[in-house]
């Protein structure tokens, strides 16, 4: 798995900082590429890492631009890893047909 792009953001809540990373991931798939997304949240308190949460959806589409659009959607709305599938589920169901078109 390769990382093609990373979008980072932070949210401050009382004495805790939550750092979000949204990664566009790429992997070889049959004779082409498949793109997915990994989301990670790191919680810091007093500059000490206290919690990490991560989730990913691999092989969303073989069309990089579509997956980049989803990456921006997640970053713009500061979606946490736990809600990744809830937010992207219908997009993933639609975009998976891109692989059939490529065959």
Predicted stretch roles:
Residues 7, 30, 63-66:
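A generic structural micro-environment signature
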Residues 31-55:
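A short, structured beta-strand/loop element
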Residues 50-64, 69-74:
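A short, exposed loop/beta-hairpin motif centered on an aromatic-Gly-Thr core
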Residues 44-48, 61-65, 82-85:
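Glycine-rich loops and low-complexity Gly/Arg-rich segments
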Residues 1-23, 28:
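Negatively charged, low-complexity tracts enriched in Asp/Glu with abundant Ser/Thr
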Residues 66-103:
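Compositionally biased, intrinsically disordered linkers/stalks adjacent to structured regions
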Residues 20-22, 35, 91:
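Aromatic side chains
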């Amino acid at each position: 798995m390769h990382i093609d792009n990373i979008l980072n953001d932070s949210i401050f809540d009382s004495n805790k900082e939550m750092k979000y990373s949204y990664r566009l991931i790429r992997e070889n798939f049959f004779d082409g590429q498949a793109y997915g997304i990994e989301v990670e949240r790191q919680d810091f308190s007093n500059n000490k890492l206290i919690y990490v949460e991560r989730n990913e959806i691999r092989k969303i589409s073989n069309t990089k631009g579509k997956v980049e659009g989803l990456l921006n959607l997640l970053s713009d709305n500061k979606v946490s890893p736990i809600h990744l599938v809830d937010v992207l589920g219908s997009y993933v169901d639609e975009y998976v047909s891109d692989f059939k078109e490529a065959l």
